[in-house]
Amino acid sequence: MFSSVNTCWTLVGAFLVYFMQAGFALCEAGFTRAKNTGNILMKNMMDFCIGTPCYWLIGFGLMFGGTGALIGGFDPFIQGDYSHLGLDIPLWVYIVFQTVFCATAATIVSGSMAERTNFKAYCVYSAAISLVVYPICGHWMWGGGWLQSMGFHDFAGSAAVHNVGGVIAMLGAALLGPRIGKYDKDGKPHAIPGHNLTAGALGVFILWFCWFGFNGGSSLSLSTDETMTLTGLVCFNTNLAAAVSTCVTMLFTWKRYGKPDVSMTLNGSLAGLVAITAGCDTVSPFGAFIIGFVAGILVVLSVEFFDNIAKIDDPVGAVSVHFANGVWGTIAVGLFSDGGNGVGKGLFYGGGLSQLGIQLLGLIVVDAYVLAVMFVIFKVIDKTIGLRVPAEVEIDGLDIHEHGLASAYAGFAISDANSAAMVPNENTDLGEDDASKASAKQMDAAVPVVREPAVIHDGIYDTGMHKVSIIAKLSKFDQLKTALNDLGVTGMTVTQVMGCGIQKGTSEKYRGVPVDTTLLPKIKVEVIVSKISVDAVVEAAKKELYTGHIGDGKIFVYNVTRVVKIRTGEEDFAALQDVE
C-alpha cells in the first residue's frame, strides 16, 4: 500500500529539483557575456528535454533495473518489475524524482563549456550522459551496485550528481580549450566578467531554495517520527553549511583580494550546498559547519588553481563548485559521519579509516570511469560534428550564429554601473558634494570640455544653436538628467556606449584575476540648445559628473547649422520647441 504523505513529499522534492534548471540557467547566463545568453538558455532547456526521454529509454533501467554489481538491467521504456526497490510510493513518482536528478548532472557541464561549444555537440553529449554515464555511476552508488554493497554513502548526490557532472565539466573544458582572449601568449589569465550579476545572484537564491527539495526530498518519506526528524536534520544541515560557506568565502576573498568578491561569494553558497549533500543525513550540525567552512575556502583556491595553474577556462566556476566540492563532500562523510542513518562512523567519530577508505575508493573508480567514457565521446564528437565553434562564431557570439538571435535583450534600457554612488535626495544629500569642494582647475581637468570654433568653414558662422554631447558614467545618468531638466532642457538623446580610456582599472578584480580591459560602459547624452546658455548646461553637467577621479567623463560642444522638425517642417529655433 502506498503512502500518500511520502508520495506527496517525493513529488514536491521532484518539482523543486526540476526548478533548479531555472537557477542554473540564470547563474550561467549572468556569469557569461550577453552575446551568448540565448545559447545558455537553450542549452539548459534542451539538456532536460533531451535527458528525460533518454533516461526513460534505458537510463532508469541501467540504474535500478536489477541488483547486479555493475549495471541494473536493460529495460527499455521501463516495462519491468521494480518491486526489489521496496518503494512505498508509486514507481512513476520515483521515476520522476530520479529523472530530475539525472538532468541536474547534465546541466552542470553546460557552464564550464559555455561560450565556445557547438550546440549540436552539446545535444549529443547531454544525451550520452543521461543514457549511460550517469545511470551506471548511479547504479553503483544508489541502485544496489558494488559500491553501495560495500557501504559507500552519498545521501543526495555529492558524488553521484555533482562530482560526476563536475568531472565531465572539467574534462570538457580542458578538451575545448580556453575562450579567445582568456590567456595571453605567456599564459597570463585575463578576467572575462559576466554581464549580469543580478541574474547570477537570483539563480543562486533559486538553487539554494530548491536544494531543500534536492536533499530533503531524498528521504522519500515524512510518514514517521524517524523520517520527519531525519528530513529536518537534512534541511538544517543543508542550510547551515551553505550559510557558513558563503560567509567564509566572503571573508576569505576580502582578505585575499582587498574587497569581498561578489561572484566568488555566490559560488561559495553553491559550494557549501554541494559539499553537504553527501553527508547531510549522517553528520551533526557541527560537522555541517566544518564542511561548509572548508567548502568556502576550497572554492576560491580551486578557481585560482584552474585559472592560473591548470589553465582550464571555466566561465562560471562549475568545476570548482561541483567537482572540487563534490569530492570534498564525499570524503567528509568518511571524516564526520556520526553513525546516523545506518552509515559507518567517520574517522573523527571513532570509525577509523574504514568509511573514509570506501569513500575514497568510490570517488577514484567513478571518476576514472566517467573520464574514460566521456573522453571517447568527446573525441568522437570532435572528429565528426566538431566540439568547438569556429573563432568567428565565438567572437560574434553564439546567439547570432547558432540560433539566429541578434540579442537576448530586446529594446533599450539604462543599466546601473557597478558603483556605490547614490542619487542625492533629501535623505542622502547631507552637505558639501565633491564638486563644491573642487577648484575650477580641478573640475576642468576631471571633466574636459571641447568646443568647436565659432567659424565652421567657408564663412559659415555660429547660428546660436549648439549640440552638447556628454559622455559620463552610467550611474550618473539620473543626476545629470535632473540637473538638465532643472535648466529647462526637456529633450535629449541617450545612448549606451563603450568608452576606451587610458585607465586600466587595475584595482578591479573578477574571481581574483585583475580586469585589464580598457572598454568601460558609458552613457552618451546629447542635447540641442539655443535660448538656454551653453555655459549653464556645461557647468551643470560638470557639477553633477565630478568626483575627482579618472573617468568622470567629457563634454563636447558643437555648432549646429540647421535643425528641421520632420512633423511640421519648422526649422532652427522653432523646430526645437516641443509643442503641438
Where are these regions (language model features)?
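Glycine- and aromatic-enriched membrane alpha-helices
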Residues: 1-457
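Positively charged, small/polar-rich N-terminal and surface patches that mediate targeting and assembly
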Residues: 401-405, 420-580
